[in-house]
Amino acid sequence: MKNLRIWSLLCLIWMGVLAASAQDTGKEKISLGDAMPAITLNSEIYGKVTPADLKGKVVLVSLFATWCGPCQIELAEVQKTLWPKYKDNKDFKLLVIGREHTDAELKKYNERKKFSFPLYPDPKR
């Protein structure tokens, strides 16, 4: 009986590994050092950001979620140290992107956090 449980557990784990490795999101994988993919961000609050807006600029991209603890620490640090130093630099662009969040959700979130940098939605991730 004990051997049957062990084999059953191993089979379940193996099936999970196979299922996870078989998933293909159809999205191109990005590696460190690759060029940034051409993205367009649309915000009812902050407007549209296109690849042309980013050309020739240093771009810092921060992907976050409102429920993510480490993200909250990172964004607070960006607000405190990085944003005041670079916000007026025409060659710098900060893209803080709320994954799976809408403009309305980000607006409500920012009413609490009081960040002075733009938050762009990515509701469809």
Which residues does each predicted region cover?
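Positively charged n-region of N-terminal signal peptides that target proteins for export
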Residues: 1-6
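Bacterial N-terminal signal peptides
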Residues: 8-17
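N-proximal helix/coil linker or "cap" segments that precede and/or mark the start of modular domains
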Residues: 18-38
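A short beta-strand-turn-helix
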Residues: 38-59
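Conserved helix-turn-beta segment immediately C-terminal to the redox Cys motif
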Residues: 57-58, 73-97, 111
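Short pre-active-site segment immediately N-terminal to redox-active cysteine/selenocysteine motifs
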Residues: 57-59, 64-67
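Acidic helix N-cap motif at the loop->helix transition within catalytic regions
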Residues: 104-107
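Short, internal strand/loop/helix patches
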Residues: 110-125
